[in-house]
Amino acid sequence: MKPSVILYKALPDDLLQRLQEHFTVHQVANLSPQTIEQNAAIFAEAEGLLGSNENVDAALLGKMPKLRATSTISVGYDNFDVDALTARKILLMHTPTVLTETVADTLMALVLSTARRVVEVAERVKAGEWTASIGPDWYGTDVHHKTLGIVGMGRIGMALAQRAHFGFNMPILYNARRHHKEAEERFNARYCDLDSLLQESDFVCLILPLTDETYHLFGAEQFGKMKSSAIFINAGRGPVVDENALIAALQKGEIHAAGLDVFEQEPLSVDSPLLSMANVVAVPHIGSATHETRYGMAACAVDNLIDALQGKVEKNCVNPHVAD
């Protein structure tokens, strides 16, 4: 008899078929208390869980006594109670490598669109304001040869540094938990403390996961140390930034502009002051959102769940020690 798994995110037909070759698959719309209650017997028997954008906490785990592995269609896993999973020896799988290049593309797009005011001036053209040769009030700022500061030199940070260094001749500063020899050798990147990075960078790109240590890592103090001409980019996790402090820094002119793919609360409230600022490019968490990459992430998540329930955790596992 095939193991039972719960799928709470739609999959392309071929990937669903692959999952069904290995498991009895039960599809649900979400992981809300109502859904769990209505499908209590299914949750009680499930050994695997696959999906994204839902909280997996101790309360849910209490309804799933046979659960052995969870697989998220994402690199981030801050919506999972890792401690509770680990205590139950439940594997948590994620997709850290599939989306690297695509997210780096998004970061570079935010750098370019904020510096060159692409969204703002495009809207002005659509509004009929382009009635003569443009003047300084339409101008942006250069990207090439400007200093890029990267906070978080992981896979995505490396991919961004590659684009910036080779494509735009940008000097690279970085801050991370440890020195990154490859970044220093390939991109002539310079490790520095966070304060120095903030003070010297023309663009500050934040690419950090959300943890207890990174929550509100960026606040009024950090924005106050940046150049008034600096542009802030966040494509990591929204709560790493104190959004009210960011809004205040933009309103006071402490920083020049911001390009944001993530926010403290998502979706972003229509009343957010960020949406009324011409110098803010706000996009709806599109970091990995291309057809090709989202398919690749889903395929990886399916393979991860198959591997996990077969006892293979050589890669893509957040807590591999529970399999020992």
Swiss-Prot record:
Disulfide bonds: none annotated. It catalyses: glycolate + NADP(+) = glyoxylate + NADPH + H(+); (R)-glycerate + NAD(+) = 3-hydroxypyruvate + NADH + H(+); (R)-glycerate + NADP(+) = 3-hydroxypyruvate + NADPH + H(+). The active site is at R237, E266, H285 (proton donor). The keyword Cytoplasm applies. GO terms for cellular component: cytosol; plasma membrane. Keywords: Cytoplasm, NAD, NADP, Oxidoreductase. InterPro entries: D-isomer_2-hydroxyacid_DH, D-isomer_2_OHA_DH_cat_dom, D-isomer_DH_CS, D-isomer_DH_NAD-bd, Glyo/OHPyrv_Rdtase_B, NAD(P)-bd_dom_sf. The keyword NAD applies. It is found in: Cytoplasm. Homodimer. NCBIfam families: PRK15409.1 (NF011938). HAMAP family: 2_Hacid_dh_C_GhrB. This is Glyoxylate/hydroxypyruvate reductase B. It comes from Escherichia coli O17:K52:H18 (strain UMN026 / ExPEC).
